[in-house]
Amino acid sequence: IIDEQLLWFAYTQSGDPVAFFIVIPDLNQIIKHLNGRLNWWGMIKFLLLKMRGALTRACGVIFGVVPDHQGKGVESAIALRFRTAARENPFYPYETMDMNWVGDFNPKMLRFVSQLGATNEKTYITYRLFFNPDQPFSRCPKVG
């Protein structure tokens, strides 16, 4: 289920696509009320909950900019437009947005998230267990 308010694309003046930002509604807010049953009654209940406004959270899924246009303000323009569109629309149903799995090795994406006005509420830590303890460990290099 995709909400058109959450899909953003950027184009050049000639009409070539240069960037996109795709966000989806967090359907877990509704699915938890179905108790794992997505039968006919579950589908009706799903639609009723959706129409009633049970979806208040969205999840940022993917963001990308064509390499030739990176660092030219396209990222900031999408972030600013997304943010103002949400604030200007009185019927905008989403109160929060999760931007999961933005690694600390990706400073460009961290900057984009901060431009959206986001705060860091969760930090995920990935642990490694080497079967060969003599193998050297190297951290993931920074992107960009």
What do the predicted segments below correspond to?
Residues 20, 69, 124-127:
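Aromatic side chains
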Residues 16-17, 56, 74, 123-125:
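Generic structural motif recognizing short loop/turn segments at the entrances and edges of beta-strands
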Residues 3, 13-14, 46, 51, ...:
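Terminal substrate-recognition subdomain of acyl/acetyltransferases
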Residues 32-34, 70-73, 110-111, 137-140:
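Short conserved micro-motifs at the rims of enzyme active sites and ligand-binding pockets
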